[in-house]
C-alpha cells in the first residue's frame, strides 16, 4: 500500500454494478484511498470473483459485509473507511455494522428508505467514534458545478421550468 493512503473497503459494487465503479474511479482520482478489502456482492462466488477482478487479496475478500466488518476491525492493517454502494435498502444495515466497529462510513445516497431507518442510523453514528458521510456524487461534476454557478449568478434570468434527462447504460 502506498504510504499515507486511507485503507478503503467497499460493500457492494462488484461485477455489473454501475455505481461501485464510479466510486472506485473517484477514489483513484482523489488518490487518497487504496481499495484493500471488499464484500462486493450478496453472493459469495460473485463477491470473490469481483475482488479478484480488482486485485484485492483473497484473504480480504468477503461474501458477507458483517464478516468483513468484524474481521477488518480486528486487523492491525484493517480498513479505515468503507464505501457503501449497495442497493438502497441495504445502506442502513451495512453502515450501522461498520459504525458499530468505529470504521468510517462513506455511504452512497439515498441515506435510507424510511425515516425510522434514518433516525436509527443517526443514533448509530452518534454512538460511534467514526465519521458518517453521505455522498451526492454528481454535485462534484464540472458540468453540474457550472450549471449551479450560472443559475446562482442569475445568468439565465428567473427560472420557471427545468427539464433534465439522465441517460444511464
Residues of each region from the PLM?
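Catalytic cores of eukaryotic secretory-pathway lumenal/extracellular enzymes that build
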Residues: 33, 42-44, 92, 117-120, ...
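Beta-loop-alpha module in the N-terminal Rossmann-like domain of NAD(P)-dependent dehydrogenases
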Residues: 60-124
Amino acid at each position: 500500500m502506498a504510504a499515507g493512503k486511507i485503507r478503503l473497503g467497499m460493500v457492494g459494487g462488484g461485477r455489473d454494478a454501475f455505481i461501485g465503479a464510479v466510486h472506485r474511479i473517484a477514489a483513484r482520482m482523489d488518490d487518497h484511498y487504496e481499495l484493500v478489502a471488499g464484500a462486493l456482492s450478496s453472493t459469495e462466488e460473485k463477491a470473490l470473483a469481483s475482488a479478484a477482478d480488482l486485485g484485492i487479496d483473497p484473504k480480504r475478500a468477503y461474501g458477507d459485509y458483517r464478516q468483513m466488518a468484524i474481521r477488518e476491525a480486528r486487523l492491525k492493517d484493517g480498513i479505515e473507511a468503507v464505501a457503501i454502494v449497495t442497493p438502497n435498502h441495504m445502506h442502513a444495515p451495512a453502515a450501522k455494522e461498520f459504525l458499530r466497529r468505529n470504521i468510517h462510513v462513506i455511504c452512497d445516497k439515498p441515506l435510507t428508505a424510511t425515516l425510522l431507518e434514518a433516525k436509527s442510523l443517526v443514533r448509530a453514528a452518534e454512538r460511534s467514534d467514526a465519521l458518517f458521510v453521505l455522498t451526492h456524487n454528481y454535485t462534484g461534476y464540472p458540468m453540474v458545478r457550472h450549471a449551479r454557478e450560472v443559475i446562482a449568478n442569475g445568468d439565465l434570468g428567473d427560472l420557471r421550468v427545468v427539464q433534465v434527462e439522465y441517460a444511464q447504460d
